[in-house]
Structure formats: structure tokens, C-alpha cells
Curated annotation (Swiss-Prot):
Residues 291-392 form the Fe2OG dioxygenase domain. Zn(2+) 2 binds at C33, C36, H54, C58. Changing P317R: In ECYT3; marked decrease in enzyme activity. The gene is EGLN1. Residues 77-87 have a biased composition (Pro residues). Signal peptide: none annotated. Its EC number is 1.14.11.29. Residues 65-129, 160-184 are annotated as: Disordered. The lineage of its organism: Eukaryota, Metazoa, Chordata, Craniata, Vertebrata. Cellular oxygen sensor that catalyzes, under normoxic conditions, the post-translational formation of 4-hydroxyproline in hypoxia-inducible factor (HIF) alpha proteins. Hydroxylates a specific proline found in each of the oxygen-dependent degradation (ODD) domains (N-terminal, NODD, and C-terminal, CODD) of HIF1A. Also hydroxylates HIF2A. Has a preference for the CODD site for both HIF1A and HIF1B. Hydroxylated HIFs are then targeted for proteasomal degradation via the von Hippel-Lindau ubiquitination complex. Disulfide bonds: none annotated. Residues 89-103 have a biased composition (Basic and acidic residues). This is Egl nine homolog 1. It comes from Homo sapiens. The beta(2)beta(3) 'finger-like' loop domain is important for substrate (HIFs' CODD/NODD) selectivity.
Length: 426
């Protein structure tokens, strides 16, 4: 087993953007398959779990897990590696990458920042649209791109429920809520917001931000419900695809719980989910080539404010069906200069990144696949967010077939009881 060596002439930024764990999507402290030298893993356990799938495309594979992985560094090509014996010989680094870029002053505004030494003049080309109060909606400058979801085996589960009841199509999303165009007092209908802002922003940039989504009162009620869940001990450690590998807490430091929206004390969270569904329903058929026919339950997440975050990763690296990530933030008076906690998105193939501050009543959409690697930078104050993932019908169906035929690296679980983590909504 040969390790990748450092040196000049290393991979380009676009090549680095395509290097991630084939199983969980993690993008740091990678190990390279020493046989084909084109696939990467964050640990040997994930390599073993992915072998049944990977051996079909691994050059020189012999039908068994006979190849190993070596530590990957981004700064140079490695010499050709000899085919290792069936027993892997390289030790996995036990220290997971926890490095984050420090949040700068302007990084808290939801605008694009250039990665040094990119030209700052090329960084900002915001897409603005209706929002409530004095707020505005900003989409980052990025090609159609694609979390926070956890790469979590129990996230997906077959269900056949209808979308939750929601407001009349075209109506405002909440009685006293936002979605008002700048300078206007009349709420912007969900249909107009979806078709005139979200659809074009997503198709052009792959990232879309809507501020003052539901209004101060509704946002406060959602925050109260989330804090009540936290105070009553409903949150547990965020999970990875596999808990067999070490340092999972170094990879993600959040506490989470899963909500359907019908639980006692979660009625306003249910309203939020219905409002998200309204927007997606209006967008459906117009977001790329996706046909959205379901979603997960809501993942309510809390970073406790002790400097934890979530390292750079991809929500859906393996075609599990998730196509759109939708995140709602609950953090009043958030100051990223003091509290950090920025969601930084690295759109594939772009010299810029997008910094999204987790501001109160802010809604964020982005593609869930490999086009949008992202990280949550260390948070030094309690940071709350609610995330829902929407499924593409065709990719979801293919993922289920892969699971049923033994390609379990897709991590789709079927036929779970109704109180399990994930849920399809049709």
C-alpha cells in the first residue's frame, strides 16, 4: 500500500472538489484506493463497506477486498502503487479534520467570498427577490450546485403519506409572516416567490436564500418549540453513515432530533414544514430535471456553542435520492464575527465560496448532491437549524433498487416502523 506523496504540481481546486469519501462524502483527511487511485475514503471501514460496489469499477480488482488506501494529500501525485496483499496495511489517521476557515466580518452576510487568490470583483453577483420586512433574499454566485444532512443510514425510509396540509396554493405562508417584496406591505404569494425567485435562482446558482420567511411571531414560536425539545432531552448526537469509525464527534458536533410535525408541542414546526412543502410543490418540475415526490422528516439540529461544527462534506454523494436541501435558521441577533457558525458552501468548479450566516427566520435551499460540498464552521453560541431533504422520484427509485440488490453503500433502509428517523412524503 503506497501513500500519496506531496510535492509541486498537485491537483487543481476543481480536482480537489471532486475528491470525497465514496461512502459518506467527507472531503478531508482522505485515503486513496491504492489499486485504482481514483476513489477516496475517509477511513478503511468505509472502504470495506463500499467494496461490493467499488470492486465493479476498480481497475485490476480481483473480486475481493484486496486493495488498501493510503493517506491522500492534495499537494501532488503519488507514484504508482503496487497491488497490496488481501490484508490492508496502511493505518488510518485517527485525527479527523476539524480545520475551518475563521469567519470574517463580511462572511456573515450570506454573500459570496472569493477563495484566495481569486479576484474579489468576481465574487458578488447576488440574486435578490421578495422577503419580509426590511430583509432581502440573496442567492450566492455559483453554477447550479448542490449536508446538512447527515450521511445517515437511518435517514431514509419508505412511507406513503401525503404532504401535510398546507395553506391554499398561492396564499402567503403565514398570517403575519414575511415574503414581502422590498418596499411593499402586501405579502408575496408562495407561487410568485417560487416561480419568480426560487426556481431561477436555483437553476442559475444552485443556492437560494430567502430572509424573513415566516415573520417574527411565527419564527419565535418555532424557536420556542425547538428549545423545549432541547430542554427536555430529546436531542442526541448527530450520526454518520457508520459509527464504527473513530472521531465521529470531530467530524460533526451537533445534537439532533427528528420531527414529523404532528407531535404535541411541535405544531408550529409542522407549519414550517407545510410552508416548505408549498414552495417545493410550486417549484416542482422546474428545478432542473428533478421530479420531487417526497421528503424526509425534519432534522432539528443544535450546535451547543462549544466550538463544534461539521467538517466539509456532501449531503448526497451516492445517489440516495435527495436532490434539494432546505434549511431554516432560528438564531436571533446572530453575529458571526463573535459566534461563528457560518455555513460555507463550495460550489463545484467555482473559485468562490458562499458564506451563509444562520440568521433568524432565514430559509436556505441548495442542491444536495456533489455539486455543493459544504461545512458548518465552529459555533461559539447555541445555534439552531431545521433541515428537510426532498427526494427526486427517479433517483430515489434507483437507490431502492441498488439497496435491494445488495449495494448497501447507498444506505437506504426500507420498511422501518413509523417512528423511525426518515420519512418519504408523497
Amino acid at each position: 500500500m503506497a501513500n500519496d506523496s506531496g510535492g509541486p504540481g498537485g491537483p487543481s481546486p476543481s480536482e480537489r472538489d471532486r475528491q470525497y469519501c465514496e461512502l459518506c462524502g467527507k472531503m478531508e483527511n482522505l485515503l486513496r484506493c491504492s489499486r485504482c487511485r481514483s476513489s477516496f475514503y475517509c477511513c478503511k471501514e468505509h472502504q470495506r463497506q463500499d467494496w461490493k460496489k467499488h470492486k465493479l469499477v476498480c481497475q485490476g480488482s480481483e473480486g475481493a477486498l484486496g486493495h488498501g488506501v493510503g493517506p491522500h494529500q492534495h499537494s501532488g501525485p503519488a507514484p504508482p502503487a503496487a497491488v497490496p496483499p488481501p490484508r490492508a496495511g496502511a493505518r488510518e489517521p485517527r485525527k479527523a479534520a476539524a480545520r475551518r476557515d475563521n469567519a470574517s466580518g463580511d462572511a456573515a452576510k450570506g454573500k459570496v467570498k472569493a477563495k484566495p487568490p481569486a479576484d474579489p470583483a468576481a465574487a458578488a453577483s447576488p440574486c435578490r427577490a421578495a422577503a419580509g420586512g426590511q430583509g432581502s433574499a440573496v442567492a450566492a454566485e455559483a453554477e447550479p450546485g448542490k449536508e446538512e444532512p447527515p450521511a445517515r443510514s437511518s435517514l431514509f425510509q419508505e412511507k406513503a403519506n401525503l404532504y401535510p396540509p398546507s395553506n391554499t396554493p398561492g396564499d402567503a405562508l403565514s398570517p403575519g409572516g414575511g415574503l414581502r417584496p422590498n418596499g411593499q406591505t402586501k405579502p408575496l404569494p408562495a407561487l410568485k416567490l417560487a416561480l419568480e425567485y426560487i426556481v431561477p435562482c436555483m437553476n442559475k446558482h444552485g443556492i437560494c436564500v430567502v430572509d424573513d420567511f415566516l415573520g417574527k411571531e411565527t419564527g419565535q414560536q418555532i424557536g420556542d418549540e425547538v428549545r423545549a425539545l432541547h430542554d427536555t432531552g430529546k436531542f442526541t448526537d448527530g450520526q454518520l453513515v457508520s459509527q464504527k469509525s473513530d472521531s465521529s464527534k470531530d467530524i460533526r458536533g451537533d445534537k439532533i432530533t427528528w420531527i414529523e410535525g404532528k407531535e404535541p408541542g411541535c405544531e408550529t414546526i409542522g407549519l414550517l414544514m407545510s410552508s416548505m412543502d408549498d414552495l417545493i410543490r410550486h417549484c416542482n418540475g422546474k428545478l432542473g430535471s428533478y421530479k420531487i415526490n417526497g421528503r424526509t422528516k425534519a432534522m432539528v439540529a443544535c450546535y451547543p456553542g462549544n466550538g463544534t461544527g461539521y467538517v466539509r462534506h456532501v449531503d448526497n454523494p451516492n445517489g440516495d435520492g435527495r436532490c434539494v436541501t432546505c434549511i431554516y435558521y432560528l438564531n436571533k441577533d446572530w453575529d458571526a464575527k463573535v459566534s461563528g457558525g457560518i455555513l460555507r458552501i463550495f460550489p463545484e468548479g467555482k473559485a468562490q465560496f458562499a458564506d451563509i450566516e444562520p440568521k433568524f427566520d432565514r430559509l436556505l435551499f441548495f442542491w444536495s448532491d456533489r455539486r455543493n460540498p459544504h461545512e458548518v464552521q465552529p459555533a461559539y453560541a447555541t445555534r439552531y437549524a431545521i433541515t428537510v431533504w426532498y427526494f427526486d422520484a427517479d433517483e430515489r427509485a434507483r437507490a431502492k433498487v441498488k439497496y435491494l440488490t445488495g449495494e448497501k453503500g447507498v444506505r437506504v433502509e426500507l420498511n422501518k416502523p413509523s417512528d423511525s428517523v426518515g420519512k418519504d412524503v408523497f
